[in-house]
Amino acid sequence: MCDQQPIQCCVPIPQCCVKGSSFGPSQFSYANNQVLVEAPCEMKVLECAAPCPVQVSQTACQSSTTEVKGQAPCKTTKGKCQAPCQSKTTQVKYQPKTTEIKCQAPCQTQVSCVQCQAPCQSQVSYVQIPQPPQTYYVECPPVYYTETRYVEYPVSTYMPAPALQPGYTYVECPAVGQGQGQGQGGFSTQYQYQGSYGSCTPQSQSRRSYSSCGPQNQSQASYSYCEPQFQSGPSYTNCGPQRQSQASYGNCTSQLQSRASYSNCSSQRRSGATFSTCAPRCQSQGTYGSYTSQRRSQSTSRCLPPRRLQPSYRSCSPPRHSEPCYSSCLPSRCSSGSYNYCTPPRRSEPIYGSHCPPRGRPSGCSQRCGPKCRVEISSPCCPRQVPPQRCPVQIPPFRGRSQSCPRQPSWGVSCPDLRPRADPHPFPRSCRPQHLDRSPESSRQRCPVPAPRPYPRPQPCPSPEPRPYPRPQPCPSPEPRPRPCPQPCPSPEPRPCPPLRRFSEPCLYPEPCSAPQPVPHPAPRPVPRPRPVHCENPGPRPQPCPLPHPEPMPRPAPCSSPEPCGQPVRCPSPCSGPNPVPYRQELGCHESNPCRLDTEGPRCGSYNFTQRQESNGSCESGDVFSGSHGLSGCGDQGNTCGGMNCGAYGGAKGAYF
């Protein structure tokens, strides 16, 4: 009808009129007041600037009817067009799954004239498009509200059961509700959103209530002899299902649980619980009483859901957390020579055994009575795990610094002398670590010479004289370099940590002479410089001055020395020993600084050395620590093993790492 209409196309009709099949909604895109007609297939797309600005009224955007009231340029898309262009109404109905726009546009001749200067000032097109893949609403985002309402019809199975009280018989009552129900055993279920059963006829109310299977008329049902099983798939013995969020029961009163089933009343097939006395005793899950719930994920004999307690550790290795306390896993004191691999969790706070002996090592066993710096080895003397008292010692998190003995002020600060100092007082029970200098050097340089040692401790850098007893393996290492020995440790004054040694390098500088340590210390961890033998000499290993003659000492793994730990024994310097021999990564007794366990790697060798028995509080021979993590000399650790055998701590890491 284009030719019959006085339509002035903005362009010549050959170009302006588009022939083609009807357009789906996706062919129109509206941008910048331009109607972009995407012609399907071979059709030509015309862009006409709409002279009439399209004013969109977002009227029905929300109800899946997009009403575009606009002075839209009269774009006429091919369709059955019976209307002239000036007052056409394009109604596109969103038929589900139909993406065809039925335009009552003029031009049955398959010519759609696009009136660019269209007179269609007040043209309203109602587009109801059936979920087109792309629908362009002018300034109105397509809002397809598909409201699907699902009416839940619970699948209720009624199990015919004898009436709980005589005189109540359930007749087959026709369902009186919107829904239809399935009934078994002569019960009719009314599947309604709400319903109540009078005499088995639903009373269509917001909640079902049963008196004696009669309605109790309440929003929450109470049942005299009926029990509601309010759950999605309930099975009711006596009464029809009462599906509500809460119920109170006359005889069989469920205690208002979301999951309850009642034994006398009816077993409800649920994952919840059944109750013998009709009172649910366990909210969560369980079976109760004599009736077993039809479908139950858990059943408990006594109506009590299993109470989840903290797991008890069978394998004695408590979970790692900051402060575990182990009741039975650990022997209360070290005396029991071994414990079941009780590896305490690694923690940064030191833990102190409550049995910490007064200053001075306990005799006979290496009790870790000092702060256990961060790591307890699972050693035969399982330290008694008492809730660690917070000691000022702060242990930095474990950082594998196997190679270096960098001076870390933090260590000095955070790690008190773990070893008993020369002072006679061992750590008090309070387990306060003895105050030690905050600098790693200071802590490191406890060089009190242990008197009791049969062999003189090499306080000065002079090579330590051979001790009467062979030191544990001298950790033979490459010849000690002629490093100037640090000044002898004449006194227990803390000495700065010697520079990090590489394994390759002998430990030329003496390790800080620490007071004789009762505990052999694992050989120096593999530091870039090999340390002279860190044979755990109970004697202070004041100067790791590498002896010129690196004679490999026999490795008496225990490295135990008779000396008491009373003095803050510095971990024996690698050079110290009857014949300190520098060695690279040689296995030997390594002493670890407990304070540095986290950061240290094996100093000298990977031997696990057995703590030496010290007369005063010797480490038990069973204490085996992995030397790999042991620190070599306390000297470079910056901490003396004050109050504790270094051996006890040395290599403690092995247990955890």
UniProtKB/Swiss-Prot annotation:
Alphabetical UniProt keywords: Cytoplasm, Phosphoprotein
Residues the record lists as Phosphoserine modifications: 442
Gene: Kprp
Organism of this sequence: Mus musculus
Composition skew (Low complexity), residue ranges: 292-302
Any GO BP annotation: establishment of skin barrier
Residues covered by region (Disordered): 285-320, 425-493, 517-568
Domain of life: Eukaryota
Cellular compartments annotated: Cytoplasm
Any one of the GO CC terms: cytoplasm
Amino acid composition bias (Basic and acidic residues), ranges on this chain: 434-444
Compositionally biased intervals (Pro residues): 449-493, 517-530, 539-561
Protein name stated in the entry: Keratinocyte proline-rich protein
Keyword Cell division in annotation: no
